C-alpha cells in the first residue's frame, strides 16, 4: 500500500469550516490550521520570552497547531453547536476523532508514527493548552474579520468565543488579546 498520509493531509484545503453560518468568505481547515500554528507558536513565545513563564517549546506548539484538526480530513468539520450539544455527543465525537487519528497514523511508515502521534491525537499535555488557546483565537479572528465585513451572523459566535478565551485563564492569551488583537480590526492602510 502507498503511504497516503501526506496526500490526505493536503486535502485539508477542501474542508470548509463554519458550515452552518453564512460566510462573507469561506475558511478551509488548511487555512485555519496554518493560522492556529502561527498563533500557537506566538503564544508559546509570549509565555516564554515576554512573560518569563515556563512552558512548552514554541516549535512543538506550531507543529501541533498544524495538525490539530487533521482528523477532520476523514470526519469533516462538525459544527461546534453539534459537537458540544451534550456530554454524550461530545464523548462520542472525541472517540470518532481518535479513530480517525489512528487511521491517519496507520498511513505512515511505522518509524514515523511515534513522532506524529501526539500531533494528530492532541494528547501532549504540554502543548495542548497552548494549541487549544490558539484554536479559539483563530476562530475569534475569523469572527472579527466577518464582523468587519458587515456579517452580523458572527456576532454571537464572537461573543461566545471571547467568553471561552477569557475563561481559559492563559496569561499568554490575555497578553495577545490586549496587545495584538486590536490590529485585526484595522484595514490594510492602517496596518502600514
Language-model segments: residues:
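Alpha-helical, largely C-terminal catalytic domains
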Residues: 1-192
Amino acid at each position: 500500500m502507498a503511504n497516503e498520509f501526506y496526500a490526505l493531509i493536503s486535502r485539508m484545503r477542501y474542508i470548509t469550516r463554519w458550515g452552518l453560518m453564512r460566510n462573507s468568505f469561506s475558511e478551509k481547515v488548511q487555512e485555519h490550521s496554518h493560522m492556529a500554528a502561527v498563533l500557537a507558536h506566538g503564544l508559546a513565545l509570549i509565555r516564554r520570552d515576554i512573560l518569563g513563564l515556563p512552558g512548552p517549546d514554541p516549535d512543538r506548539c506550531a507543529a501541533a497547531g498544524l495538525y490539530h484538526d487533521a482528523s477532520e480530513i476523514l470526519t469533516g468539520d462538525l459544527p461546534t453547536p453539534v459537537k458540544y450539544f451534550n456530554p454524550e455527543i461530545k464523548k462520542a465525537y472525541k472517540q470518532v476523532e481518535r479513530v480517525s487519528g489512528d487511521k491517519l497514523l496507520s498511513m505512515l511508515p511505522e518509524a514515523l508514527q511515534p513522532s506524529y502521534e501526539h500531533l494528530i491525537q492532541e494528547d501532549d499535555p504540554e502543548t495542548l493548552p497552548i494549541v487549544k488557546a490558539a484554536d479559539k483565537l483563530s476562530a475569534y479572528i475569523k469572527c472579527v474579520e466577518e464582523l468587519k465585513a458587515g456579517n452580523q451572523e458572527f456576532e454571537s459566535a464572537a461573543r461566545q468565543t471571547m467568553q471561552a478565551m477569557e475563561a481559559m485563564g492563559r496569561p499568554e492569551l490575555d497578553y495577545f488579546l490586549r496587545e495584538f488583537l486590536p490590529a485585526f480590526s484595522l484595514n490594510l492602510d492602517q496596518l502600514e
